[in-house]
Amino acid sequence: MLRSLVSSVTTGPTPEWAGRILMAFSGHISQQRGRRRTLTPAPWLPPVKESVPKSSVGISQGTKNLLETVIEKETLAASTIAFQNSQETNVSVVDIPDSSRRVGLVVRKIGMLPQWTNEGNRILCTVLEVDENHVVSITSPEAWYKSSAVGKRKAFNRHGPMWRVTVGAGNDDPTKYTLGYRRQFVRAGIPVKEKLGCFLVTEDALPSAGQPLDARHFGVGQYVTATGKTIDWGFQGGMHRWGMRGQPTRRTTKSHRRIGSVGSVGDARIWPGKRMPGHMGYEWRTVSGLEIVRINVDKQVIYVKGSVPGDIGETILLKDCLQEEKRLKSGPMPTWAPSLETIEEEPETEPEEGTIPKNLLFNEKFSPKLFRFTSPSILFTDADAKKATGRDKTKAKIAKVKK
């Protein structure tokens, strides 16, 4: 009867959902699960780092010093050229349509720090450092589709064709890496990067190869999405990994923290997906809807309200939030450039006593609701000054003698 009902609703071959219903009612269960996490890179990927650094194989100390000087000058020259190219790039602050996808930033989590609002409420923020981000390469959707299995899923999706933009972070010693890894940075004209991250970008928001990315790519008050690997806890038991209760504390011998029975009543096997002791953490996770409350321009540091996945020192991919009510409406396209910088002219006044001169402070951007520690915390009005002072409560009361 069920099969005839399904055939009356559908025409042609039986769809997948109908097959699941038939198997469920017939006593068979169709189990759906994802791919298992791996801790090592795929074997077909080329090596990134040299097994034996070239600087330690039969090279005298004088030659090493010469190579270090040449590498330092090449890195400085590449950074200078990239900065000059960024000044020539045409950028503007425009309204961003819902179909556009901008590039993101590869940041490093350096800790958590509390901030306070103007009302005195404490909010815990994550501090993220933008370390020398540059655009390494741009791959068209056609080339990405042909060359990668991931590109076959993401190059042409429901949002239209997507370009893969690779961003590098953190300048490093090129002698540590293989020739094949260094070639992509030579083509872009930038220093060798330690970390790489890829983003899906639409055609109207494509940056140029070798373009530097600044922390001001995001604005204060904007909502972002953070993706990273969770804290690596190593091999853990069922109580820590899955929150199981364990066995009774009394009348139990050496089984207090065991998970108990793992049988499936008749199958003579353990079902895939059974919660058991094993490796905990180090999984890719995404947290969306995080608000940026503060940006330190001089140190390239972003303060994000809330927590992000990963331990201190882990690499995080930061991009625009796509939630409907938290989507970016207006911003720099394709990214921020020095041509968008505006110098705010303030009247020259002598600093008040007890305040820090502005030339000694960092160039920072704050959310309007965030309290700045250079501002006074308590303001007294004339009405407060006219109030009668009360009794000194630190001293004992003394009865007045009647005359």
From Swiss-Prot:
It comes from the Eukaryota. InterPro entries: Ribosomal_uL3 (IPR000597), Ribosomal_uL3_bac/org-type (IPR019927), Transl_B-barrel_sf (IPR009000). Keywords: Mitochondrion, Ribonucleoprotein, Ribosomal protein. Pfam families: Ribosomal_L3. Residues 32-56 are annotated as: Disordered. Belongs to the universal ribosomal protein uL3 family. This is Large ribosomal subunit protein uL3m.
